[in-house]
Amino acid sequence: MTESSIHDPLTIRRLYGRQQGHSLRPKQAELVETLLPQLEITTEQAVSATDLFGDDRPLEFEIGFGKGEHLAGQAMMRPDHGFIGCEPFLDGVVGLLTHIDNNQIKNIRLHRGDALDILEQLPDGCLDRAYLLHPDPWPKARHAKRRFMNHGPIGLIARKMKKGGEFRFGTDHPIYCHWAMMIMGQRPDFEWLAQTPRDFLQRPEDWPQTRYEKKAREKGHEVWYFRYRRV
């Protein structure tokens, strides 16, 4: 590994934090045992709309889906699209499986692990939308390279998106907000869609609220919603 690659966020594969929290309840354990194997994407398989869903439907991708509220909501709004979600933590995976089971959602596939691994497997120019909502802000300057919002990962997202596709990013952390605006402002492959401040201070109607966002609002935090078009 070269000196430059050591500092390239695409080479960072360490996951910080616990991958499992509390013990699973019987129903949750059943979902992991029976439903997860039907929906799980591995790093060894082919990953395309046809491979995952049997047809060439539009694809959307969420990086770190948390407990799955947003991904499930988007999938229910557009049942003719295919949705891929990646989340390393079992509690989050169980949350999404619960949404899928309760609502009989058929158009989601998921990966328990690093989103970059699956992004790299996708065909170039295949994604209609990509989502990065409330990622860990890593607020200390010395941890900036751990932020997903860096040129390495964003460049990979750009390569996997269709021209005219949309990348959405949300955060309630001011340091991450400013950092994201700096990174995205340096990229000629994305166009910020905001016309007025209201556009990134108010959640769009087709942007389901996450549990994390709700908690942030309850704490009195401002939340910022960014939409970018792939050009």
Swiss-Prot record:
Binding annotation for S-adenosyl-L-methionine: 62, 87, 114, 136
Catalytic site: 136
Enzyme class, UniProt record, top EC level: transferase
Molecular function as annotated in GO: tRNA (guanine(46)-N7)-methyltransferase activity
Pfam families (UniProt xref): Methyltransf_4
The keyword Amino-acid biosynthesis belongs to this UniProt entry's keyword annotation: no
Residues that bind substrate: 140, 172, 210-213
EC number(s) per entry: 2.1.1.33
Involved pathway(s): tRNA modification; N(7)-methylguanine-tRNA biosynthesis
Keywords, alphabetical: Methyltransferase, S-adenosyl-L-methionine, Transferase, tRNA processing
Superkingdom: Bacteria
Catalysis performed (reactions): guanosine(46) in tRNA + S-adenosyl-L-methionine = N(7)-methylguanosine(46) in tRNA + S-adenosyl-L-homocysteine
GO cellular component: tRNA methyltransferase complex
Known function: Catalyzes the formation of N(7)-methylguanine at position 46 (m7G46) in tRNA.
Family: Belongs to the class I-like SAM-binding methyltransferase superfamily. TrmB family.
Protein name as annotated: tRNA (guanine-N(7)-)-methyltransferase
Name of encoding gene: trmB
